[in-house]
Amino acid sequence: FTWQGELQGRADGRFTYRVHGEASAPFLRNRLGLCVLHPIRETAGQPAVLEHVDGTIVPTSFPDEIDPGMPFMQMRALSHEVAPGLRATVRMTGETFETEDHRNWSDASYKHYCTPISLPFPVAVEPGDVIEQEISLTLSGSESRVAASTSPDEPMTITISDREVPMPGLGIQLDTDGHVLSPDEITRLRALHLNHVRVTVTPRHSPADLERMLVQTHAIGAPTLVVLDGADPGAFMSFHGDLRIREWLAFDAQVKVADPRRVRFAEQVLGAMVGGGTYLYFTELNRARPAASDLMAFSVNPQVHASDDQSVMQNAMTQGVIARNARDLYPDSRLVISPITLRPRFNPNATMPELDVSSTPLPSRVDARQCLPFAAAWTALSIKAIAESGCIDAVTYFEATGWEGLMERTGGSPQPKDFASTPGEPFPVYHLLAALAGATTVRPCMSSEPDAVDALIVDGTAFVINATEQAQSVLIAGRTVDLDPYAIVTIPVGGPA
């Protein structure tokens, strides 16, 4: 399949993107064409006008709460006000488009895509088949009535509120590849004063395997969250009432949401709090709405759809929206996000997982940025979004060591060219969690330019975050803070007035 694209901008405020493609060999497709993203921060809950493919025009609005389905269908055009006196219209031709609320997967966007999911797929594409699509963006209105939100000469600012919310408990995963922690690694992890350590038990694991995991979590000094990933709860009855285990999750990776009957059975045989929810994303909870358990869980990663630096950073803010929506669904449950990872752990929608190969030189679960300041900055933004929501009880971040962890192992990276870590070194994200050890309260704050700089305010200390690859300066608590790319700078800001 070969294609050509054409971009055209006109003085009258119209921007057009055209694509022409032709198949030279047969293949199967799910979707093939253009996508349009509307940003969440500027459009959530805002009124819009939708034009359908049959020409009918209806008033509507961008969803405020996360929509589990498709909020806009049979789309030809969508228009909304972007500033007083200025209106934007996106027109889509060549296919039938519809919209997903991408916040379900923690993206900071609504996505307009083709082909509609309701149509059969995959679709056979034959040699000579032509695909032509056009997306146009038209701005209309009185330019004189539109004022810039900030002047380029004005400094970026962060304003701290007097409100306080509890810090959720922060935990990690024990390494899922079976790595046994060294004494030095255990010492470092003990210094984090973790709320919990997550371990995963599959049908391949025996009670002796779980005991070996518990020896490590006990050495770290943190309670254990045990995930039964398809394992029979009855096989682990010997751990009934084990004080090293705070709670269990009864999942089956072959089923998108936990069966409440399985959760109740596990509670009976294990004598502890057992939770349900989903092994996957908030999407599954939002769509299936399983019955509440005392503990409900779901996972998050920012790269279900896009992996560029800017998208990943922007997606962190959506975790706060997810947290609030999850609390609305389960007002009385203990809510845990577990785990949060940089990359997807697997593709739950792959019909042939063996063909779902990595898009980088590293395994698909591994992100080369894990050992860089980027991961620490992103994690600080993630903690900010979740903590400020006041809706989540605990969060599991990453693994203990290695490619998906907080520190490099003494043997170093298996692919040092692609994952440029130093053997035995703690990653910047470790230092962030160490600085947050024992944290109790968070004060929400607001940045004038949150895509560039933001802050996490914890127990009288501001963790000022640069979310970009450029140096930035920001005014906070009466002082100017200069930040290197993806840097975190801490300053004292005191408590509420």
How would you label these PLM feature ranges?
Residues 79-155:
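Beta-strand-rich recognition/accessory modules
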Residues 1-24, 101, 106-109:
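Extended, loop-rich substrate-binding clefts of extracytoplasmic carbohydrate-active enzymes
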Residues 250-373:
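Noncatalytic carbohydrate-binding groove/subsite architecture in carbohydrate-active enzymes
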Residues 201-239, 257-273, 314-316:
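Aromatic-lined substrate-binding rim segments of carbohydrate-active enzymes
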Residues 128, 338-428:
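Aromatic/acidic polysaccharide-binding cleft in carbohydrate-active enzymes
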Residues 447-477, 486:
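Carbohydrate-binding surface patches
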Residues 12-95:
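Polysaccharide-binding surfaces and accessory modules of carbohydrate-active proteins
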Residues 170-225, 243:
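Catalytic domains of carbohydrate-active enzymes, especially glycoside hydrolases
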